[in-house]
Amino acid sequence: KILKFSKKLGVNIIKRPLSLCKDDSSSESAIKNVLDNLSFRVDNIIFLQVTSPLREPSDIDKAYRRLISTKSDSIFSCHKAEDYFEIWSKKGNKEKYIPITIDYKNRKPRQLFKEDHFMANGSIFIFKKEILSKFNNRLGGKINVYEMEEWQSLQLDDIKQINAMEILFKNKLKKFYV
């Protein structure tokens, strides 16, 4: 149904092979498949995550201009982290937790953090084609960020987030999309 609808709109469709339609298929492999099937040359890739849709109309243009003006190779969208999150990982089924973002043995007060911290929000990735070829990743080379508002970092991965998005849409986003 989606393919038929897209064809009616004149969209150039590149079907993803079944080998790239698995739960563990990477976005990078899907992007490479598209690039291999294009009939024209591509220098930069703009990759928008469907589960991170809160972009204002100008965000993509601003992110692209930032990539160019900073002579970066790749850029990702984020928001400034006003709080420093301690992220831990559970190791297997055991009650063993490993710190990811902190050194708990040498903890310093948050007031002593001088540098800004940023949380990637997954909304926008822009990168040079050769970065994907060289690193098999959307990020590499000179990496930069495009800063967005924190409310734009809401994800759409489960029903709670979808409900929160509906509330946000009614209260803040309607002016952009209606």
Regions found by a protein language model. Give the residues of each.
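Residue-level signal for well-ordered alpha-helical positions
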Residues: K8-L9, R138, L168
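Conserved core of the sugar-phosphate nucleotidyltransferase
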Residues: D24-S29, P53-E149
